[in-house]
């Protein structure tokens, strides 16, 4: 199977997000890479589902709360930018303060 670098990145993000979901389900607090992967994957999947950039900017702030992450992680992520593929092309989605 031949994958482009972008496809490899998407697969890596999805894998990290899946691991984060499992750890969260077990009651573990997520670390920085897990939190970023989970929020990023939610945005990418939302774009694939046809949601708008504005909807995803809001949804990105609801994926995780401070209770879901280790101490200090929320402060380490002032914003997340995701280049997501929408039905009408690729767009940049920026989520400010994704963990509140």
UniProtKB/Swiss-Prot annotation:
Entry EC no(s): 3.5.1.5
Catalytic activity: urea + 2 H2O + H(+) = hydrogencarbonate + 2 NH4(+)
Gene3D superfamilies with a match to the protein in the record: Urease, gamma-like subunit (3.30.280.10)
Entry keyword set: Cytoplasm, Hydrolase
Positions of disulphide bridges: none
GO molecular function, one term: urease activity
Recorded superkingdom: Bacteria
A matching Pfam family: Urease_gamma
Subcellular compartments: Cytoplasm
HAMAP family: Urease_gamma
Subunit note: Heterotrimer of UreA (gamma), UreB (beta) and UreC (alpha) subunits. Three heterotrimers associate to form the active enzyme.
Family statement drawn from the similarity comment of this UniProt entry: Belongs to the urease gamma subunit family.
Name of the protein: Urease subunit gamma
Native organism: Cupriavidus pinatubonensis (strain JMP 134 / LMG 1197) (Cupriavidus necator (strain JMP 134))
The organism's taxonomic lineage, starting at the top: Bacteria, Pseudomonadati, Pseudomonadota, Betaproteobacteria, Burkholderiales
Primary gene name: ureA
């Amino acid at each position: 199977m031949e994958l482009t670098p972008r496809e490899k990145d998407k697969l890596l993000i999805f894998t990290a997000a899946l691991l984060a979901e499992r750890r969260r389900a077990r009651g573990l607090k997520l670390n920085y890479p897990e939190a970023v992967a989970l929020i990023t994957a939610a945005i990418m999947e939302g774009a694939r589902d046809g949601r708008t950039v504005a909807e995803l900017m809001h949804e990105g702030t609801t994926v995780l709360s401070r209770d879901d992450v280790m101490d200090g992680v929320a402060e380490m992520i002032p914003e997340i930018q995701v280049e997501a593929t929408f039905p009408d092309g690729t767009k940049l989605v920026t989520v400010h303060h994704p963990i509140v």
